[in-house]
Amino acid sequence: MISETIRSGDWKGEKHVPVIEYEREGELVKVKVQVGKEIPHPNTTEHHIRYIELYFLPEGENFVYQVGRVEFTAHGESVNGPNTSDVYTEPIAYFVLKTKKKGKLYALSYCNIHGLWENEVTLE
């Protein structure tokens, strides 16, 4: 099962774990997901975060909603070779969803070397 390959940990000590922060303004929920907040993750052609996905599981429901996915596609590569462009996308994603419900926010991040990482927070 794929769930057996997804890793987690404390984001303060593990650079791959996505950090989820949110603000609720009525029905609008503004979410920031970041990899490497406490310990920077490498961002090179050879080692980088490819994407972040955000899911929402409303309280009392059995299935998640995919809120969104952000891909990071610039990692220093150019026609001159790896790490030659000085253009890098940082693994930070912003999402806005509209809901009155409480529940869980789940974030997944994908490192091209170390695989899938997850984190969750309770949405009040």
UniProtKB/Swiss-Prot annotation:
Fe cation binds at residues 14, 16, 41, 47, 111, 114. Disulfide bonds: none annotated. It catalyses: reduced [rubredoxin] + superoxide + 2 H(+) = oxidized [rubredoxin] + H2O2. Its EC number is 1.15.1.2. SUPFAM superfamilies: Superoxide reductase-like. Keywords: Electron transport, Iron, Metal-binding, Oxidoreductase, Transport. GO terms for molecular function: iron ion binding; superoxide reductase activity. The keyword Iron applies. The keyword Electron transport applies. Uses electrons from reduced NADP, by way of rubredoxin and an oxidoreductase, to catalyze the reduction of superoxide to hydrogen peroxide. Homotetramer. This is Superoxide reductase. The lineage of its organism: Archaea, Methanobacteriati, Methanobacteriota, Thermococci, Thermococcales. The gene is sorA.
